Amino acid sequence: MPMPLNQLLPAAESGVLIRELTLDSRKVRPGDLFLAVPGTQQDGRVHIADAVARGAAAVAFEAEGAAPMHAESAVLVPVKGLAGQLSAIAGRFYGEPSRALHLIGVTGTNGKTSVSQLLAQALDLLGERCGIVGTLGTGFHGALEQGKHTTPDPVGVQATLASLKQAGARAVAMEVSSHGLDQGRVAALEFDVAVFTNLSRDHLDYHGSMEAYGAAKAKLFAWPNLRCRVINLDDAFGRELAQQAHDSRLIGYSLSDASAFLYCSEAQFDDHGVRARLVTPRGEGVLRSNLLGRFNLSNLLAVVGALLGMDYGLDEILKVLPQLQGPAGRMQRLGGGDKPLVVVDYAHTPDALEKVLEAMRPHVQGRLVCLFGCGGDRDRGKRPLMAAVAERLADVVWVTDDNPRSEDPAQIVADIRAGFCAPEQVQFIHGRGDAIARLIAQAEAADVLVLAGKGHEDYQEITGVRHPFSDLIEANEALAAWEAAHA
């Protein structure tokens, strides 16, 4: 519904009707409000003339440092500190959708996608239709539209929530990235439950230090009117977070601390998944899931904690857990049986790679083989750390490309190589498709092959161009060739 400009922006005198909001001048249509803010890569104010030419009814722009400007056909509104107000402005325009939804924010270095996807499935099964916003896209489980960022821009977030609400969502599970928190993309949302999975090295190219990275994550747990905090007590930063005094209810979960609100004992892992006894102040029960790995058991506890925080009963929660499926590219299994078992996972940090390799070790009868790379234009410091993890936990290690972006792939490989004690034992192959094909071709039926880093991604980004590429497709084709060769 169009809204008068002076209702949307108190500083505006004009009541011109605004049809839509946009931060991108190329998307402006007649009647829109163009929001021009300085960004990390470019200043939106340089595109004001373009927005006006495309028919913008009004332009709100950052007043600080702005050059004098004039437009005949559009209302210009200078706003000091506009970037910090974008979420609130968009919230007003789209009818404050988060207030009408059960909004669950999930943050952490690893596990955000799995927890949000599992939580949405569980809520659907419990009769509360749940939307999803995150790395795999936005929408509903099984029908996601891919987006560019884990957490969309402030206007995109509010528009997405309004769209999900209109489509019938009563709840939304949202991945909340540290960038999103630091840049105020979710500033005016009303979260009911906040979930913390873990904190390990990532994004230091942006945050500069682990302290700044952790501080960005911590913002979500001091949110106004938050009802419940669900925190992983097996994580050192999680324990710090849990000790901070807030009005919201705390549900801590742990695989090792029997004093936690949610505690798993007697966990049994096999090729079919996990079975464990769940101990809570509300009683005990048996948790069953077909997901692999200890870290996925931790993810399931996060889901249970969020559902308890939303006042679902333990018995009804435990009934739906066996029906939950892991998201695409997260510990996704291909082959197995009389063929090599290939596991495709998004692990792209040292901690995530460690967890995946440790999770797969009990399933190995032959060799545990790890193929990985590191993304270009990202934290260089983690590259040798990932090499050390792979060398320590896998029997065989192959290194290849993983979204080199604008960097020279040879430089990325050199950074990784520095982390190996015995680099002469490692295969280095540029061309990820070729590496996957050769790796699977030489595998034995008893081997477990972990393809780490890209997971669900359907592209390889090289010098700014995203070329179609999928680990899942490449692995399936290579497994078919392996089967033909061993027939």
UniProtKB/Swiss-Prot annotation:
Binding site for ATP: 108-114
N6-carboxylysine sites (modified residues): 217
Signal peptide (UniProt feature, chain positions): none
Residues that coordinate or bind UDP-N-acetyl-alpha-D-muramoyl-L-alanyl-D-glutamate: 23, 25, 150-151, 177, 183, 185
Cofactor(s) needed: Mg(2+)
Protein's pathway: Cell wall biogenesis; peptidoglycan biosynthesis
Subcellular localization, as worded in the UniProt entry: Cytoplasm
Motif position, Meso-diaminopimelate recognition motif: 402-405
Enzyme class, spelled out: ligase
InterPro entries: Mur-like_cat_sf, Mur_ligase_C, Mur_ligase_C_dom_sf, Mur_ligase_cen, Mur_ligase_N, MurE/MurF_N, UDP-N-AcMur-Glu-dNH2Pim_ligase
Swiss-Prot/TrEMBL GO biological process terms: cell division; cell wall organization; peptidoglycan biosynthetic process; regulation of cell shape
Superkingdom to which the source organism belongs: Bacteria
Keyword set includes Membrane: no
GO CC annotations on file: cytoplasm
Catalytic reaction annotation: UDP-N-acetyl-alpha-D-muramoyl-L-alanyl-D-glutamate + meso-2,6-diaminopimelate + ATP = UDP-N-acetyl-alpha-D-muramoyl-L-alanyl-gamma-D-glutamyl-meso-2,6-diaminopimelate + ADP + phosphate + H(+)
Parts forming coiled coils: none
PANTHER family given in the database record: MUR LIGASE FAMILY MEMBER, UDP-N-ACETYLMURAMOYL-L-ALANYL-D-GLUTAMATE--2,6-DIAMINOPIMELATE LIGASE MURE HOMOLOG, CHLOROPLASTIC
HAMAP family according to UniProt: MurE
Function of the molecule: Catalyzes the addition of meso-diaminopimelic acid to the nucleotide precursor UDP-N-acetylmuramoyl-L-alanyl-D-glutamate (UMAG) in the biosynthesis of bacterial cell-wall peptidoglycan.
Name by which UniProt lists this protein: UDP-N-acetylmuramoyl-L-alanyl-D-glutamate--2,6-diaminopimelate ligase
Organism: Ectopseudomonas mendocina (strain ymp)
Record lineage: Bacteria, Pseudomonadati, Pseudomonadota, Gammaproteobacteria, Pseudomonadales
